[in-house]
Amino acid sequence: MINNPKVDSVAEKPKAVTSKQSEQAASPEPTPAPPVSRNQYPITFNLTSTAPFHLHDRHRYLQEQDLYKCASRDSLSSLQQLAHTPNGSTRKKYIVEDQSPYSSENPVIVTSSYNHTVCTNYLRPRMQFTGYQISGYKRYQVTVNLKTVDLPKKDCTSLSPHLSGFLSIRGLTNQHPEISTYFEAYAVNHKELGFLSSSWKDEPVLNEFKATDQTDLEHWINFPSFRQLFLMSQKNGLNSTDDNGTTNAAKKLPPQQLPTTPSADAGNISRIFSQEKQFDNYLNERFIFMKWKEKFLVPDALLMEGVDGASYDGFYYIVHDQVTGNIQGFYYHQDAEKFQQLELVPSLKNKVESSDCSFEFA
C-alpha cells in the first residue's frame, strides 16, 4: 500500500461541513437578500468590437462563426490534400518563374545546357590519337588525349572551348625527351566562327586563335578537303564523297581548276569566301575544321620561360575526318617554320574504352 493524501482530505471535508451546520442552527437565521437581476450587471466580453456581449451571446457567436477553424488554401490540411492531388491546371506555382512539371497539367521540359553540345564518333572524352608532327625531314612522335568535347549544335553559340585535351610530343629537345601541353580548340561552324579570323568575335578567349585572313587562306588551302569543299559549291552542290574523301564534284573539275599552291590561289579562294554558301550544320559535314591552341606546359604549368628549342606560342589549323577518324593539321607561328604538318590516327583500343563509360547530369 501507498499513502494517498487525496483520500484523507476528502474524508475530512464532511466533518467540517457538519460542525458548520451545527453553528448555523445555534445562531438565528438571517434574512436572505433579494436576488440581483442578471440584466442589471451583465457579463461582457470585448472581442472585436466595443459593443458588449452577453455570455450566452458570446458562446453562440463562437459556435456560429467557428473562429478556430482555418479555411486558408495555405493551411496544413489544404497542402496535404494538394500533395495527393494529381497534376492539374488548378494547382498554383509556389516559386516565381517555376518551370517544374508538378505545377501544370502539361509538364514543361527544361532543357539543360548539356543538350546544346554533342560528341561525335571519334571526338569524345578519353579518346586518344597517335601520329607524328613533321618538320622538314624530321618526324616527332605525337600523342593526343581528349578530355572534354562540347561541340555546339546547330544555332547554338558558346565561348567555352569546344574541345580540350593534352598533346605530348617526343624527341623535340634533348633536354626534355617528352613535352606535354594542355590545349583548347574551337570548331569552325561557318557562322560566328568562320574560316577567316576577321569573322571571329572580338573576345579575349578567341584572340589567341586569330591570324590575318591571308594567313588563314594560305593554311586552309593546303587541306584537300578544304579545296574540295569550296570548289564543289560552284558545281551545283555535288558534295558526295568516296571512301578516300574525294568529292564527286572535285573529280569532275579539270586539273587546272584545283588549287595547288597557297600563293597562287589565295585570291581565288578569297572570292569563294565572299560567296560562301550557308552551311546548314557543320556537324553534318564529313570534315570538321578546327583551331587548336596550346595553353601551357603540364605538369609544370608555372614554367613561364618555356623550354629551350620548343615553343607553343602558335596554334594548329586542324581538319578531322568523321568517317576515318583521322586528324590532319598545320602548325602556325610567325617565327616558326611554315607548314609543319600534324598527322594523327585514332586509337581503336582507346575508342572502345572511351565508349564504355558515359555520364549524363539531370
Curated annotation (Swiss-Prot):
Induction: Rapidly induced by a shift to glucose-containing medium. Residues 240-249 have a biased composition (Polar residues). Ubiquitinated by the GID complex, leading to subsequent proteasomal degradation. Residues 1-40, 240-267 are annotated as: Disordered. The keyword Membrane applies. Pfam families: Vac_ImportDeg. The record marks 133, 294, 316 as: Interaction with the N-terminal Pro (Pro/N-degron) of proteins that are targeted for degradation. There is a cross-link at residue 20 (Glycyl lysine isopeptide (Lys-Gly) (interchain with G-Cter in ubiquitin)). GO terms for cellular component: cytoplasmic vesicle; cytoplasmic vesicle membrane; cytosol; GID complex; vacuole. Substrate-recognition component of the GID E3 ligase complex recruiting N termini and catalyzing ubiquitination of proteins targeted for degradation. GID E3 is regulated through assembly with interchangeable N-degron-binding substrate receptors induced by distinct environmental perturbations. Required for the adaptation to the presence of glucose in the growth medium; mediates the degradation of enzymes involved in gluconeogenesis when cells are shifted to glucose-containing medium. Substrate-recognition component of the GID/CTLH ubiquitin ligase complex. In the absence of stress, the complex exists as an inactive anticipatory complex (GID(Ant)), composed of VID30/GID1, the E3 ubiquitin-ligase RMD5/GID2, VID28/GID5, GID8, and the RING-like subunit FYV10/GID9, awaiting a substrate receptor to form the active E3 ligase complex. When cells are shifted to glucose-containing medium, the substrate receptor VID24/GID4 is induced and becomes part of the complex, named GID(SR4). This is GID complex substrate-recognition subunit 4. It comes from Saccharomyces cerevisiae (strain ATCC 204508 / S288c).
